Design a protein with these regions (language model features):
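A short, well-ordered alpha-helix in the C-terminal region of glycosyltransferases
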Residues: 338-352
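Active-site-proximal region of nucleotide-activated glycan assembly enzymes
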Residues: 46, 57, 116-180, 188
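C-terminal alpha-helical cap of glycosyltransferases
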Residues: 352-368
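Conserved nucleotide-sugar phosphate-binding/catalytic loop shared by glycosyltransferases and other
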Residues: 4-12, 30-80, 85, 231-233, ...
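Structural loop-to-beta junction motif characteristic of Rossmann-like glycosyltransferase folds
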Residues: 56, 120-121, 266-267, 284-292, ...
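Donor-nucleotide binding loops and adjacent catalytic segments primarily
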Residues: 45, 50, 54, 177-184, ...
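Acidic donor-binding loop of glycosyltransferase active sites
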Residues: 97-99, 263-277, 285-286
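Glycosyltransferases and closely related glycan-assembly transferases
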Residues: 87-101, 108-123, 136-144
Length: 368
């Protein structure tokens, strides 16, 4: 028991927090197969399904964020924070972690606060170019802060920062099939130019609208499309497409093999979440970024501009997307020189082995 490595990993809410968390856990297990890893997430959020599916145990806290529009609702939020703090104490008392990792998201607040108060060393991993509220609050208590962008000393003590990049999904990096094989896998012409549209794990209304408003261009472009609508929008979209002949358009609510989808793509259209951007950098994939306006501190636009300012991506404003996005994508995918330039520049920004580097830091903290 005493020699077992016991690590808590906390946070979640979106795929952008969960994928790095699972990657870090996998890297720790690869280095220390004896490690016991416990996740702590927020009840009702995506991590409660995704983490067990990845093979790890998770405990849920009844926590949520503050409602900035309906202030009276925050009385209930304060109670949930208090209750989550008490539950976190019980979880930590029973599990006895030797180190804690926070990846952002509501649950990491009470979990790492309790760990720090008990002298358990903490590491936080900030995926974005603009630090999240939870991580900013935890920074004083963390011993190490792993980041993916330059200039993060604006938010965190410089002596704690380690530039690691963001851990990404291994299946995205390890796909060995050719682009032609990948297109065949999706039932498409192996030789035709292909655009992949993804709106994050929840879907993106404006990206979806950009296709629905320009179906004539889809039909006439000579380009084929793999379109992840998101579960929330899928039924309505399928109803709108009913009866139309669209063999060049493969529509799905969720792409399970994203590695194959990216391999099939000559160009990707995506939100500007930090994890997605890290994947595009590592695989060298030309991308048009449409940052979500519905995120804290407009951090997705800041993520996108870090690439756009280095000619490593194309930016389309969310409000403009329904009108201009699809034409810009079709024009770009037919411009070989532009694709080659985007590919070359985005590759320069990729930081490899991020999960391994972070796992090493966690193990050091746990065993010092």
């Amino acid at each position: 028991m005493n020699n077992e490595l016991r690590i808590i990993i906390s946070g979640g809410g979106t795929g952008g927090h969960i994928f790095p968390a699972v990657s870090i856990a996998n890297a720790i297990k690869a280095k220390r197969p004896d490690a016991k890893i416990l996740f702590v997430g927020a009840l009702g959020r995506m991590e409660m399904q995704r983490v067990p599916a990845a093979g790890y145990e998770i405990k849920g806290l009844p926590i949520c964020g503050f409602d900035r529009k309906h202030l009276l609702k925050n009385i209930a939020v304060l109670f949930k924070i208090w209750k989550s703090q008490h539950m976190a104490k019980s979880i930590i008392k029973n599990f006895k972690p030797m180190a804690a990792v926070g990846v952002g998201g509501y649950a990491s607040g009470p979990t790492l606060n309790v760990c720090a108060s008990k002298g358990i060393p903490c590491l936080i991993q900030e995926q974005n170019s603009y630090a999240g509220v939870t991580n900013k609050l935890l920074a004083k208590k963390a011993e190490k802060i792993c980041v993916a962008y330059e200039g993060m000393e604006r938010f965190f003590p410089a002596d704690k920062i380690i530039m690691t990049g963001n851990p990404v999904r291994q299946n995205v990096l390890e796909t060995t099939i050719t682009p032609e094989e990948a297109r065949k896998q999706f039932g498409l012409d192996p030789e035709k130019k292909t655009i992949v549209l993804v709106g994050g794990s929840l879907g993106a209304r404006t990206i979806n609208e950009s296709v629905l408003q320009h179906l004539d261009l889809v039909k006439e472009s000579g380009v084929q499309f793999i379109w992840q609508t998101g579960k929330y929008y899928n039924a309505a979209i399928m109803e709108q497409l009913k009866g139309q002949e669209l063999p060049m358009l493969k529509v799905t609510d969720f792409i399970s093999d994203m590695g194959a989808a990216y391999k099939a793509a000559d160009l990707v259209i995506s939100r500007a979440g930090a994890s997605s951007i890290s994947e595009f950098c590592l695989i060298g994939k030309p991308v048009i970024l449409v940052p979500s306006p519905n995120v804290a501190e407009d951090h997705q636009t800041k993520n996108a501009m870090a690439l756009v300012n280095k000619d490593a991506a194309i930016y389309v404003k969310d409000a403009d997307a329904p009108e201009v996005l699809l034409k810009k994508a079709v024009d770009t995918v037919k411009d070989e020189a532009k694709l080659a330039s985007l590919c070359e520049n985005i590759k320069k920004l990729g930081l490899k082995n991020s999960a391994d580097v972070i796992a090493d830091e966690v193990i050091k903290l746990a065993t010092k």
